[in-house]
């Protein structure tokens, strides 16, 4: 939460400075000016942060593969995720995090209800260095596409099975080496009704090839964030349901893994 705290601190300092510089505290009721002045400085500081983030993102060449971890870009990703969740007034309630103790890298499998789902997972598991396999359009979004590229997020072409399998093999290699953990949404798309969609079990090949644990998670409430953003507090849940050990994952067919994970999420 470092960036968020700095933005709040800077905006408070600038508000105090504004009062003293312009001698605004001449009457007792002038204190009511503090909130709008602070809000103005807060928005200005936030805008400045995103401007700096944009300028930093311009240094990233998405055509070049990432060869090693980039701690600075991971820090930027984590800080920006926390900032956005704070701006959106999102509160995360978690259960089962103790099941992740001792896990260095894993495949996180969850239901998909909102574009904010990855934000919640990254904010909840910052130590995991989560990366996602995502649709190619994500990498065309200004700032976002370049930052996540540096954090080993991978685009997958679902219209080309051979290319998609190449992405899965590369993700398995990164997972096996412990470079990052990966998150996937086996439904393949967001559920607009809240009902769990059929699973595409091929993505479980990432964990099978890597011999890595699978962390099964259920999220709820994320579909409300966009509608309430900043206007109303949103409480979301992040529940770790079970962890399948890597040795078991290697032996199980992907269909059985998918059926088991889906049964827990229902």
Segments the model singles out, each with a brief description of its role:
Residues 2-105:
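Membrane-anchoring hydrophobic helices of lipid-metabolizing enzymes
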Residues 7, 165-266:
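Non-catalytic C-terminal accessory region of glycerolipid acyltransferases
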Residues 57-77, 86-87, 101-161:
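Catalytic core of membrane glycerolipid acyltransferases/transacylases, capturing the structured
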Residues 87-89, 127, 148-150, 177, ...:
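Short, well-ordered coil/turn elements that cap or connect secondary structure elements
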Residues 94, 108, 132, 238-240:
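Generic preference for hydrophobic
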Residues 94, 154-157, 246:
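Short acidic-hydrophobic, aromatic-tinged amphipathic segments that line or gate anion-handling sites
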